[in-house]
Each structure stands twice: as structure tokens, then as C-alpha cells.
């Protein structure tokens, strides 16, 4: 077992809890906002998590600053996160992965207003292995003015996606389909000319999207006077065995690590 594909095939063979969902496995998903219910339990957990994250960010409590965002590194002592993981992960496993799954990385941050768009704030793809999924959960109400996530989609529900060369943990992804994993403006415009349109993920706290990391997407910059978006970003991959806790083995923003690869278990 040397490749991500071989690993995932084995993960699926050892899993007994799959359910009908419209997805055969992770390869079918592009972006979905209905994998798990936004019920009272879920929204209550999000609210409690959001309050603690907001206070920690305001108090600069174990944070990492960069040009575009304030990242909370110290989220592990928020008890409701473990309950949130236990609520949503079984649904993601049964309906999409059709295998056990591991939250490999969790980034928790607040966007900064009025910065020059760069990095993730330009149209890009993450160049992750095809077996990786990304989940964003908003902790605040998000509009098109305060840092929403955007993606391309057409009227048939199709999403343009960039292929990756990352087939095993030692592969660095080169050659990249687009230099620096940034999608040139003319390429985005070509997709728009083909009938794709820019869609904004907006909504109240608790709004989420589970997506393939290699679809065309970008973050946006909060405008002056807005309340910047605060959110959780998960990177989730298949796992051979069920963890005792979904909190087990998750990396945060520190120490820095490559979000585009994972080790085979």
C-alpha cells in the first residue's frame, strides 16, 4: 500500500456502516451543504464554540497573525468541539467517504478587513490528494461584505475542478496544473464564459459546505466597518480504523505543516 488511492480502497473495504446518499464515495463530491442536519443540537454547539473562539481571538490567546487573518492555535480546550466532531463526522463517513475518516487539520480564524487580496484570496485550488475533503463551518453570520467563501458553479450543478498529481505522501505535486496553484484570471473568465457563475457561501452562523479542495474557489476580504467572518476549516481524509475520539491526531496552525498531504495509516 503506497498510494492514496490504494489506502482509500482498503479503508472502504474495512468499513461496514455506509448508507445511501447519492455518493458512491469521496470521488463523487464537489460541494454539498446538506450532508448533516443543522438541527438545534448542532446550532447550539456552534454558538457555544463561536463565543469561546471570539473571546480567544479578541484576547490574542495563543493566536498566529498573518497579513490576511488571525488564526487561533489554542482551540483544543473548547470542550464543545469534541462534541461537534462526534455529531458531524459519522454522517460524513457514512454518506461520503464510505470509510472511517480522520480530521487531519483544523484551522480556526478571523479574516482581516481591507487587505490586498493574495494567496487564498485569489482564485485557486488547494492541490490536495483526490481523497481529501475540506469542510468550512461559519461561526458568525456571513454576507458578501464580510469575507464570504466563493466558488464557481453552473446551472447544472457542476463545479470546475483542477487535477492534481499528488498520488502518494512523498509526491510534492509537481508539475502543478497552474503555477503556484493560482488560477489565472483568464482561466476563471473562460469558465464564466462557458456558463459558470460566481457563487457566494453566505448565511447565519452554522452555515457550512463540505467540498473537494480542488474546485475553483477563493476567500474574500471583509469591507471596512463589517464584522469579519470567523470560521472553522477542516481537512478530512480516509482512515483505516475508527478513532477512540475524533479529536485524536488533529493538527492546528502551529507547528506549520503541509495541508496538501497526509501519511497512510
What is each residue range found by the language model?
Residues 128-144, 202-205, 210, 235-239:
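Short, conserved beta-strand element in jelly-roll/cupin
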Residues 146-215:
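Double-stranded beta-helix
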Residues 5-8, 12-13, 45-48, 54-57, ...:
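Non-heme Fe(II)/2-oxoglutarate
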Residues 1-121:
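Non-heme Fe(II)-dependent double-stranded beta-helix
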Residues 99-103, 124-128, 139-148, 154-156:
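Active-site region of the double-stranded beta-helix
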Residues 120-128, 215-219:
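Histidine-centered catalytic micro-motifs
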